[in-house]
Amino acid sequence: MADKLTRIAIVNHDKCKPKKCRQECKKSCPVVRMGKLCIEVTPQSKIVWISETLCIGCGICIKKCPFVALSIVNLPSNLEKETTHRYCANAFKLHRLPIPRPGEVLGLVGTNGIGKSTALKILAGKQKPNLGKHDDPPDWQEILTYFRGSELQNYFTKILEDDLKAIIKPQYVDQIPKAAKGPVGTILDRKDETKTQKSVCDQLDLTHLRDRNVEDLSGGELQRFACAVVCIQRADIFMFDEPSSYLDVKQRLKAAITIRSLINPDRYIIVVEHDLSVLDYLSDFICCLYGVPSAYGVVTMPFSVREGINIFLDGYVPTENLRFRDTSLVFKVAETANEEDIKKMCMYKYPSMRKLLGEFQLRIVAGEFTDSEIMVMLGENGTGKTTFIRMLAGRLKPDEGGEVPVLNVSYKPQKISPKSSGTVRQLLHEKIRDAYTHPQFVTDVMKPMQIESIIDQEVQSLSGGELQRVALTLCLGKAADVYLIDEPSAYLDSEQRLTAARVIKRFILHAKRTAFIVEHDFIMATYLADRVIVFDGIPSKDTVANSPQTLLAGMNKFLSQLEITFRRDPNNYRPRINKMNSIKDVDQKKSGNYFFLDD
């Protein structure tokens, strides 16, 4: 007989409302009908309780539940004994833990809701692991005995003796202004324990923000401020939860270099990051996490950087002979329309323009674009990419220059703030009534973006990633000639980013429309772009938007400004950053090839 499957039953605390339904799950359960207590609901209980030992995995309760609050997941039985933590009955559980090593940077890669932040909390000593015994949590002696013989035993012993101090840079930096008040300089002075504040501020471009109040900072400035506050404190464990969101490509690399400058033979550094090219640059070794989001997560053993990211993209763990995703994610050079189609396409032109906003001046060099083409705009924050998008959309009038062609425009802004009250379904019905039921749109956009799973939730209660997926669906669902999409990858995890890129690409090709996209995630930008528009000049002062160039020429120009070179991975063609002053880096800079399309 094959391994006996162990099941975990997950009850969603927000959705399960036994007082508002007829308890269909209990009435329809065959095990309950046989007289065993498999599903229990008392008049006092806030949510149902499902016995995982009695459950036979028939899945009837899942289909009958009116609130879609239940899910039953089969687990490979070899994981039964390796539970590290479980929040409560019928809730998420985490198996194993990543093993940090002193003097090296550990990168964690995995989708959202798979236990990365839980693992960070446990390793920081902020959450006591209960080894799955949520009703009778073990004491530390038992926990240390459990980890006996692994590197984690010494690690937890040190944490218990208060030898290790841990600092976490939180994932959601937009919450910081609620907790910290006052000028940036004052807070940095108060936290500065290592006296490295000046060099860290120079590295992260924070010097000119010292007099500004924390509540007045933009997303990218908050992110750099949060990284700086962590870097200038004295600690033994540094943890960074998504240090690159809101930052542009140049700032991402500066943040990565700053984090790597903390390396010291006695320090542990752990980074969770969804931008794979930054994670690749930052880490010395990698642990992948796989499983079912918000049901269970499993941490793999440590791999080298290249192997770890390739395992995640491939969806197969060779050491455990286990496939955790049906498809592997490969980066061929973007699929483009063939030559014959290009001749049939319409050409649109936009003129040279100039726009003054206060002290900021943006000059736009005239250019043209065709149907079925994706233009990616590359440039630092503050070079006028969003201004250009708004001028194309007709929201801003140019001060000098000709008229922009009048086109129907669909626009997804950078910051998404949900204004509508009601469910996602009502919002889709109101905004894109014809599209969201159209079979082609459902298969091209709705299914891959997993809108079905959140369609009956309140818009106000959605997380950042869910909001982003809804916003992208609304943008693509609107009939338009030009789609303007500002940062489609914000808040999405690495897997969703690649799905979103594929959805946008396929939709634009099928609909024979044009898209202008601003994107800082390098892997996503290379996958999406047919041509690129490079922005150069002095950010927030005087910048130029060049006319569209081919992917290779544009990337070379952009990367030469940043002084970074890329190579391609031979297995799945993803772009990888060369380490500063490595042989390959020096060679490519000499020959002027900052970016390779194929090796």
Report each predicted region and the residues it spans.
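Conserved H-loop
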Residues: 266-272, 512-518
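ABC ATPase nucleotide-binding domain signature region
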Residues: 101-111, 117-193, 275-306, 368-438, ...
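Hydrophobic anchor residue at the start of the ABC signature
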Residues: 226-227, 255, 471-472, 500
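Helical segment within the ABC ATPase nucleotide-binding domain
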Residues: 252-265, 497-511
